[in-house]
Amino acid sequence: MTSKPSTRNDYLPRETHNGEYTGDSPEWQLQINITNKIGGINGDIWLSRDGRSVKWCIEDQCLRQFTYNQKIIKAGYIDFEKTPDCFVVVLSDIAHVYMLKNGGSTTVCFPFQIGNAFWYANGVILERETSASFMDGGYDLKPIEFDLKHKYITLTDPMAPFGLISITNTFKGGINSASGNKTDILQDFQLVLFPSDKDKCIAVFLDRNSKVLRFYYSRILSSDQSRKGELTISSTKKTGLDAAGNSQKSGGISKDLRKFSHLTRRSTSINSNSHDFNAAERVLSGNVGNASGRTDIFALPSSCSRRSLSATLDRMGNNIAPTNRAAPSGFFDSSSANTATHSNITPVSQPMQQQQQEYLNQTATSSKDIVLTEISSLKLPDDIIFTSRRLSSILSKLKFLSLRFERREGLLIFHEPTHFCKIWLIDLLPDVLDSIPFKIYGNSPQNMIRLENLKLKEPSRIQAMYIHELLESCLILVSEGQNKEEYKACLYDPFVKITSPSKNISEELTKQNSLPSLQKLFPYPETSFTKLCFEAVKYITSPAFNISFIFLWQSAYSILLSRANDDVVGGLKMEHDAFSLVLSLLILPIPSSSAQEYQEYKEIYERDLFQHLKQDSEITSSVLPRIVIGLHLIREEYSLNVLCRNEHALLGQFLRFATAAMGWPDLWQSYYVPKMDSESKTFLHPREQNSTFFHPLDEPPSITKSLYSITENSSIPLCPFISFSRLVATDTQVELRITPRSFKILGLYELVHSPNFLPDYVLGILSSFKVDKDELQTYPLGILVPLQNILKILEDKLSEVRDNLELLDRADLQRCSAIINSIRSDSKEVLKRGQRDSYMLCKVPLAKNRSSLSKKPSDIYSILSEIVKSASQVPLDGSAMRMSNIQDDEDIDEGRSLKLNAGLIFSEDKRFTHVVSLLAYYRPTKTQFFTTKTEYAQILAQKKYFAKIMALRTCTNGVGWGAVAYATEKPISTQKWVIQPLNLISVFPDDTKITVKAPEDIAHDIVEWGQFHAGVSSGLRISKKATGITGSWIAFNKPKELDAYHGGFLLGLGLNGHLKNLEEWHIYNYLSPRNTHISIGLLLGMSSSMKGSMDSKLIKVISVHLVAFLPSGSSDLNIDLKLQTAGIIGMGMLYLNSRHKRMSDSIFAQLVSLLNVNDEMVADEEYRLAAGISLGLINLGAGQTKLRKWDSSLLGLGDDLPEDVYDSSDVEQNVMYEDLTTKLLEIVTSTYDVENDWIPENSQIGAVIAIMFLFLKSNNFGISNMLKVDLKEILKANINTRPELLMYREWASNMILWEFIGDDLSFIMKDVDIGVKFSELNTDLLPIYYTMAGRILAMGIRFASTGNLKIRNILLSLVDKFLPLYQYPGKQNLDFRLTISVINVLTNVIVVSLSMVMCASGDLEVLRRVKYLHEVASGPYSDLFQEIPSSKSDVSGVTQVTSNTNTPGNSDRERVDETAASLDDERSSNGSDISDPTAYLEDKKDIDDHYGKFISTNLALGFLFLGSGQYALNTSTLESIAFLSMSVLPTYTTPHPLQELKHFWSMAVEPRCLVIKDISTGDAVNNVPIELVVEEDVEKEEVIREISTPCLLPDFSKIKSIRVKMHGYFPLEVNFTKDYSASDFFSGGTIIYIQRKSESVFENKASFRNVEDIHVALKRKAAESKNYSRLNLKNEQGNTTSSQLVESLGIQDLTMVELDTLLSAGNNTALTDSESYNLGLLCSDKNSGDILDCQLELWYKSFGPHDE
């Protein structure tokens, strides 16, 4: 078993002064060939001499060390195709991959032994060990046989399947030779070199038998091709690693390789630095099938994906490694591709192992990653002998070095014992590489490939050679000197055949690990400034001159470094001085050998390279002037960067000297005007002008002058500027490398000053040029200020999100842009600013610029800055700093913000405060009381009656309080949570207080349910986002005696998802006391938290509480029926939307079976209703999978149903749903002549609910019509059926036809003949009332939270008609009382539906009606309907009926005529005796069903102020609609079943309150006008709504755009598209940040169209400032003219401050032409900036103050 690598940090052996590495661990060797430094990651890889340990080091610091129990084959940095920045260690049977970018790691186990490994551009090439063996049953080692065409396999990603290397052509004697045994040939072929990066293309194979090197051109097949030469040929018969003469395998990769790939692999993902190698093993399969007609490698197009296997395909190792690592047993046959097989890790017997290995021979690879084309070969000398066949032994003597130079690639082949050395070269001609003959056969022109010897001037025996790390085309050659103890080193460029001067080195530098020291002997510039100069020289000159110039610079640099002080160790000036020295010596004539100048630089003058360059007349006449022009253009480039003044000055000094020495016009010297001082003087001076150099221009090109000439008010003609691309006669791409700023700014100015330019275009232009804010700030004043002015204009008017917004000071738009970009990239984590970068293995943050790893932090400030940047991941500019002060968006809808926003939303009056007082169950109830009685005893008795009614209201207040106070608390873990108890005290207007006691005055069951509702409301106050709500916290708040309060609290916590991790012992501690309400709250709460999870443990717990789920013969556990009812709903929640057939059958059985309660079989309707709900939840939306119309013949109802127009995109048919629907419809629609034992009537409502959930929103007309109520038929035929069933059927029918629910009165009153049977109230109208209720309830859910005023007004008109009849005493006959009872239900449904439509709006019109019902006690014992003699009567003597003025919302204008009747007469006629005022108080029964009324009013008040007015009901998902439907079940009559479901709306809410905040302060901004473009729900037309914040947004799916426009703030507009919807945009919180406008620099500024206007205004302003010109400037030290003008004119602009600094009195140096034009750019454009101020300042600088 491969052991876990041990890791430790220690220090690397240190380098001594002579380059030898010593220290505590002398056994470490630098691995040159595996130090790749891909992607900018720096560091070296050191391998121990025993090959079992590897170190990753940066400079002298060891970042990580790994030790293994077997030898390391390969270690280094790799960029996999889709997983960049990896550190990989390859062992014989496993590879360890460490992701440097995210700090994770994984292991890749191989199903075969690995002999060697090679890096390549997209991953690793693995060479299988051909000598691997296994132990048979007789304990004899036998070799493992495998197909050698799979000898080399690619790995492009740790989690990807293997790939194949394929060779295309048939080359004589090559791998694909028709002659010879293919197996023997492949056995002897050894890959010795493969290009490790994308810039190189040549791979080399060694034929060990014939000693022939074969060169192959490689192509990497990937989705992202990095170089030309992609395979595009579509037809060829050549094969991959296969014999051309084998007709049976001429199809390339065999079909076996294209079958299911059962590569077994163990892969373990490890976070951070933890390593877990106990990986779970799994077998996956994938199909990479290849059509029979496409067997060649050229059939794949270049853009297609290389694989069809899943990226998660696993590979599992077998037990063939010498380490005896465990492997899975069993052979995976292709016939079991679809069978998930899980094997234990056990030793593998040899027959099974051999079978598995044979299978891997066929399926080991999935596709081709690399295609090789043989192009050349080389026969090695016979004296080269290989003593071993192992690659390490071969490469220890035979060296291969790969070089690349422009479009040429070379390989240096060096055999150290025999000193054999050859250079193989190829010209990479694109036309040839893309040709079909080359791709197939490797055909190429004769001179394209050549073999050369090393052409050294001094022949010597080469001891070692290396590639210079920074000069990849140059070799470092180490050779013997004249004496054997002397050694020399030099650079050699085989492409231009130039050798650098040799340097003597010590013998230690000829040994291993000496490369770093050797490279220091031949330095290369480290500063970007000098590198840029060298790169410019490379483009201007020939390769020979460039290499020669570099070699001369190295000599000059060494000379200057040797003469410098000890404290000088190089740097920018030293590198530039060496650069200037070489150019100066080339420009100046060679002095006499006796001259001091000659002796000073004799070492350079006498170099052959220098003399060769001086003798070349073309260099003198043409090359050097072009170099000077190029350096001048670089200086102009640096003039556009205020941070590069040092570089600008250094180039100016040299160019002034060079132009003078070359005899160019004086304009060139005067243009530079260097600020000379003793330290900065150049060491060379032109002695005389040299006329041999031509000068291309009379005056130097000036970038600022050219820009100035483009402007509108320029006083000079258009002045062109010579670009670098024109100088070197190439395309403009070179300008982006050498002079990017010049290229960008010239293009920008041309576009900005075009006739059709608008400020709106500037962001797009700057974005196309990739100019960011940091770069813009570094441009000089003349360029920066006009651009800033344009951006300021755009900043003030821009409202929509665009690209490159960081250029503007619009943090609000930047924030919106970040959200939108994260949505588009499916990166939700970017929404949270707290995101932090992962760490590397060494726990060092991986910076964006990975090259920073190579540098040590300079100081503590740098370290802290990197930590801050990594932690915040935001740029430290002004906008980001402002954003960092804002709290996380996850808190915007919670706690304190909710409470504050509630006061803002309902700030116009005290409606919210009043509703809170109505719902606060823990406070005494203020009772509205009015009476016609005069005797104290009667009044007191009536008050007691009112107190009882108010006690019922208090018991239901928790239903509404939980909705109003939803998510307003986030308790801390140490906080003791207190549930306020019910307060059953009623306070009357005369301060009389009456206390209601249980069970004396009110039923104990009602009080317990009141406590339960109070507990639920307390739990709902705790936000879903609250943390620390664990089982321990819940147990900490557990009361000593369990009660209904705590049971409800558990349900409230569960509804918000806080019971997911409740420990088992906590569950049993709660269930053991067998408290009914505790058990109900716990089971339903846990089921809600774990809905849809089908958690097995919770299923067992619930099953114990369901008698029907217990095994037959189980003892009677005496489980309360209400608990069983809650348990069956909990089972449906657990199986939510699972469509579990077995559970569906079990639940359906409960719908039609009798229940054993106390040894009595009962058909409890509440239990069956719960079973129907549970069955619907399990199969929620299952009916949407139907395609065809419903077959009504299944029920024997005939074929007279309308055609089903329902259609769905899901083509699957499930017989289970048809059978289930058939059974449910049979329950609903069947009629029976005799009564059945199981009482099907009690199952009908449950069956209707189940059908509704099955076909919810499916628009299935067939099912809907079966449920729909035919009012005309019912009223005509008087069909005997339960009236309330009509309400449920009509409700379900309309919920199925979701899209067809109307929003007008005609939808409610359809088929209702208003003129018939309305003369009096009787039970004949019950079908109409129940049908209306069902339609209104569907309408309320359909348009929930829409705020539809049309629907509101319709429902208000209806409720106003029925309110006078609510609990109206009237006649006491049964028919009338039943009718009034149905009107009560209808009114309750209307009130709840109204509140759902106007959810969270606090609508006053709705509130008035609900408040009336909530506060007024009506019924037969109320004086509300009593006759009160009026002082004024009409002529006929009819008495007016008035109501108490203390009752708000009570109006008598709409009372029906029946109220004029005498209630006393009615009571007397019915035998009612009211002389005894206490007679009716003895009965505790709620005769008039006040409890049901208060459930509806509390629910309505809760919805009306849901979440303090900041939450909305979500109807976009089936689950949300189902939960909302469960909470508004119209069970308002005794015995009020399923009260616990009244809180399930909490799983159907979403925060939708829009809050506007100031992005600078994070404070809320109120009363912000918002303009919404919303799609109407029914008409589907877009309308504009204007609202003010904080406010409730409509359904996110309906919002098309949102616009914020407030005085003093920047406008903001977000338009939603398919790419990012409003729901996505507000997923992190319904908050929008806006930015306050700063004082515009353009306010009160004049606009000037031409120079004349500016001059007139300038003279006027100069005249106004004449008083300041007389000031004694000598007495005003430090006060310049500019500061006086700024103070007097009120200029508040940093531009003037910078201008003042530039033109300060202490600066006596005259401005150069470039600086003058730069300042001229400030005031030459037509804009609204500070032109006048800048002109005035320049005028004072030029002429000074003058007295009048």
UniProtKB/Swiss-Prot annotation:
What's its job? Component of the anaphase promoting complex/cyclosome (APC/C), a cell cycle-regulated E3 ubiquitin-protein ligase complex that controls progression through mitosis and the G1 phase of the cell cycle. The APC/C is thought to confer substrate specificity and, in the presence of ubiquitin-conjugating E2 enzymes, it catalyzes the formation of protein-ubiquitin conjugates that are subsequently degraded by the 26S proteasome.
Designated gene of the protein:
APC1
Whether Nucleus counts among this entry's keywords is yes
Compositional bias (Basic and acidic residues) spans? 1451-1468
A cellular-component GO term for this protein: anaphase-promoting complex
In which organism is this protein found? Saccharomyces cerevisiae (strain ATCC 204508 / S288c) (Baker's yeast)
Q: Name one GO biological process term.
A: protein K11-linked ubiquitination
So what family is this one in? Belongs to the APC1 family.
Span list, region Disordered: 1-24, 1435-1479
Additional remarks: Present with 178 molecules/cell in log phase SD medium.
Subunit-structure text:
The APC/C is composed of at least 13 subunits that stay tightly associated throughout the cell cycle: APC1, APC2, APC4, APC5, APC9, APC11, CDC16, CDC23, CDC26, CDC27, DOC1, MND2 and SWM1. APC1 interacts directly with MND2.
Under InterPro entries, the record lists:
Apc1, ARM-like
- Write down what this protein is called: Anaphase-promoting complex subunit 1
